Amino acid sequence: KDIKPSDIMTREAFQNAIVTASAIGASTNAPPHIIAIAKHLNIKLTLDDWEKWGEEIPLLVNLQPAGDHLGEGFFQAGGVPVVMKELSKQNKINNGAMTVTGKTVADNLANIKKTENEIIKNYEAPMKDKAGFLVLRSNFFDTAIMKMSVVSEEFKKRYLSDSEHPMQFTARAIVFDGPEHYHNEINNPELNIDENCVLIIRGCGPIGYPGSAEVVNMQPPDHLLKKGISALP
């Protein structure tokens, strides 16, 4: 049939990827990588598309770090096909999109059945509502993403619940030049870091740092952790 990758990786397929990634609580690596793949196919895909198609999607999978279970349990519960079946029933994905099986999404999902389990949730009773990636815009970066499926209610209340400016926050920027600087200085009292600060590591993106590695798990300074503040923006 001479089916080529470009026949499968269409804009509709990328839309399906965005919706499915949002529903399973995928890594923040997903948006930049999927956008880069689309670019190689001359398909314009941006964070605006993630915001449009994914932000309102609920979290359907009870997996760590957003939930309790591990990947093996997700596989045994039916995995991604069962999640896509739930999304398909709600008309959230393009059922007519061609796939690597040579069949459409609808064909692939025709015989998929969801069994009752505590790992894959029904769309109407998800782990969390509106759990896709929140696209952030700021005066010191063009765009960034926040994985809402793992954002705690405490964090949301503190930073994203201003009655006049919902889903916005203003904070003092604490800037570190690389992971070593962060580790050496995060507990420096002269920085005067409080709960109204945002932590930034400069120069560790795809251009400034080899491979755009995940170089540090940024936590607040110890004195905030002792107060029960487990995360800063």
Predicted features along the sequence, with ranges:
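Catalytic or ion-coupling anion/metal-binding cores of large enzyme and transporter domains
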Residues: K1-P233
